[in-house]
Structures are given as C-alpha cells and as structure tokens.
C-alpha cells in the first residue's frame, strides 16, 4: 500500500517505528488491525472504489467498535482546508472539551446505548496516573511540532499530492482529541486513528522540498521522533495483556486482567 501512495518508503517506515505504530501493532492488536482497515478504507473511498470501501469499513468495525465513527468523521471532514487557525482551534477546543468530558461521554452513552460498555472509563482511576498524563502531554507536544511543520509546508505537499494535502486535516483533528485525552488517557487511542496518516503525509512533505532544506528538517524531525519513541516506551509502556512497567510506574509487572481484578474492574 505504501509503495502505491508515496515514493519515500524509508521515511514512512521511520515514522511507523519512531511514532509508536509498530508498538501499537504488538500491544493493542485488535485496534491496530481496525486502524489499518480504516486507512485502507479511506484510501479506497478517495479513489472512488466504493465496494472495497464498504467491505473494509465492515472489517474495521468488526475488529473495533470505534472504527465506524472514525470513518464517518474522515469522510465528512476531508474537504476542510488545513490552516494554522484550525490547528490552534483544535487544541483550544480540545482543552475546553476536556473540562466537561465526563458529561459529554455520559450524553454519548445515553444517545448510543450499545456504547454503554465504555461507561467504566468515566471514573477510571488510571486516568489520574501521573505517568499516563505525562505520556499524553508528550505525545501532544511531539505531534504539535510535526503538524506545525506540515502546515507550514502544506503548499509543497499540495503540489506533490492533493490527496495528502486533504489528509492534513486528520492530523489537526487528532491534536484536538489528543488534548482531550490529557483528562482521560484512553481517549488517546482514538487520536491515533487520525494521526496514522502522518506516515503518508510527512514523506510527501519532504518530497516537495529542495535537497538542502529537506536534509536539515529531516534531521530535526527524525531526532524528535526518536526521542519520542524512547519517551513513550518509558511513560506509556504498557501492553494490552502485560504491563511494561518502569521505574516511573513502580509496580511489579502484572497482566492488565489481573490489574483490573485487583482494582475492581473485572466482572
């Protein structure tokens, strides 16, 4: 898929590794499979391959409940033009929404009864853990810098690929969701549905630059992503089944199933 969409596949691979998508494929496997189907579904929708789009959307939904809403949002917002005003509005809006997050989630659960299984997260004690809050803030800062550069050079992207240009809005939406998740870290997993398009967008941005500028900015951004990879391994180092605890979490590594049973989240 990557070879069809971009030329600089080595850059895409580094984004995949350094920004934690490989880690996601090991840790939250069901959602990661849904994420892949979401991306491929959207790409087929963009190419007007509607039968494939429907099939891939159903497969995404089969692996993770949230996928169908993400696909709908992507198709709805894809014509919005990326800009710095939307960039700041997304972050500010996310910050304001986080203040009334519990009320918003309660309303969604009332409107969509089938989502009632998620009400356990409203008062989930792990949302207040210091390391998880730091992890979410670290991700937000990293993507704020990356998306800032992408918007700055958006015209370069547009010259190379109109489709990649239109996908910048997904990163901006991801920033808003990422900001909300400071209050409840688990929502951060929704942000990565939108963030994953950076794997396609960043190589396209570099492709539209002159050689000297490309080399300089690549060095800075690769270093940033590498630091983020180490940072996220320390502060967000957990697995769907087994926790990768560090000196910052301070607990003996136990399975999340055991953790939930100990703290009253098991049935």
Give a label for each model feature.
Residues 74-194, 235-258:
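Alpha-helical transmembrane segments and terminal signal-anchor/GPI-anchor hydrophobic tails
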Residues 88-93, 210-231:
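Signature aromatic-anchored transmembrane alpha helix within multi-pass, membrane-resident enzymes
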Residues 38-51:
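Membrane-interface transmembrane helices that cradle and orient dolichyl/undecaprenyl
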């Amino acid at each position: 898929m990557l070879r069809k969409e971009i030329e600089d596949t080595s850059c895409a691979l580094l984004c995949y590794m350094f920004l934690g998508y490989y880690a996601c494929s090991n840790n939250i496997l069901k959602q990661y499979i849904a994420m892949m189907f979401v991306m491929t579904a959207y790409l087929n929708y963009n190419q007007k391959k509607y039968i494939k789009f429907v099939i891939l959307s159903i497969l995404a939904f089969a692996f993770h409940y949230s996928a169908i809403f993400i696909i709908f949002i992507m198709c709805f917002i894809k014509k919005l033009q990326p800009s710095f005003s939307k960039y700041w509005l997304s972050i500010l809006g996310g910050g304001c929404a986080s203040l009334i997050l519990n009320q918003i989630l309660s309303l969604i659960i009332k409107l969509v009864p089938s989502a009632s299984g998620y009400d356990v997260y409203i008062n989930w004690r792990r949302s207040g853990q210091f390391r998880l809050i730091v992890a979410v803030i670290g991700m937000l800062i990293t993507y704020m810098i990356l998306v800032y550069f992408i918007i700055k050079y958006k015209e370069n992207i547009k010259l190379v690929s109109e489709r990649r240009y239109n996908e910048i809005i997904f990163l901006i939406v991801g920033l808003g969701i990422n900001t909300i998740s400071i209050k409840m870290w688990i929502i951060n997993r929704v942000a990565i549905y939108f963030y994953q398009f950076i794997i396609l967008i960043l190589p396209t941005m570099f492709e539209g630059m002159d050689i000297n500028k490309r080399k300089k900015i690549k060095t800075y951004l690769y270093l940033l992503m590498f630091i983020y990879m180490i940072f996220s391994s320390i502060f967000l180092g957990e697995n769907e089944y087994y926790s990768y605890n560090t000196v910052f979490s301070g607990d003996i590594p136990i399975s999340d199933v055991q953790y939930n049973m100990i703290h009253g989240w098991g049935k």
